[in-house]
Amino acid sequence: MPLKVSNHPLVADSLRGLRDRSTTPEEFRVLARKIITFLLYEATVDLEVKHGKVQTPLMQAAAISIAHEVVAIPVLRSGLGILGPVLELLPRVSVGYIGLERDDKTAVARIYYQKLPQLVDKVPLLLDPMLATGGSAAQALDLIKEAGGRNPRMICVVAAPEGVKALEARHPEVQIYTAALDEGLNDSSFIVPGLGDFGDRLFGTES
């Protein structure tokens, strides 16, 4: 299972800001957007293309377009916070949704919503900011496969080794793109050092 941890200094600098507990929700959103833009570049650099022609004001020129439609699939709710750059940068992108709610006592997520288009001959791109135990991502990837998705890609901001291993065992074909591979999980199955609850910090709902 390919795992790509970004080594770009701008990603590392933005990640420092995300980790800082004094970062405001407004600042957090800006930093997350920067990181996702870089990770999206890395996750799409090898997309299949098709060659054609385009008419410029002066003459015809060779042109390249993306061969297969990309379907962005954010995991609710935190995945919504990293959807923006994907919609702006990818041509002809469609969006599916998977709603997963984590039980803080068991760290197991339940599916409460799903709306996926047909994924045959498309490129599934799973958006889930934190890859902790891997349970939620594995469930989401199960649904993606059931909808016909093959060779999915996943963008997360921070990953834990436990989550990577879980996906490697259950979905070895998935390609993971992340800003950081952290030390591991604590007793509550939160990533450490991590950056806290991504959704709460993004949407300003920390208690």
Question: Model regions: which residues?
Answer:
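PRPP-associated nucleotide enzymes
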Residues: M1-S207
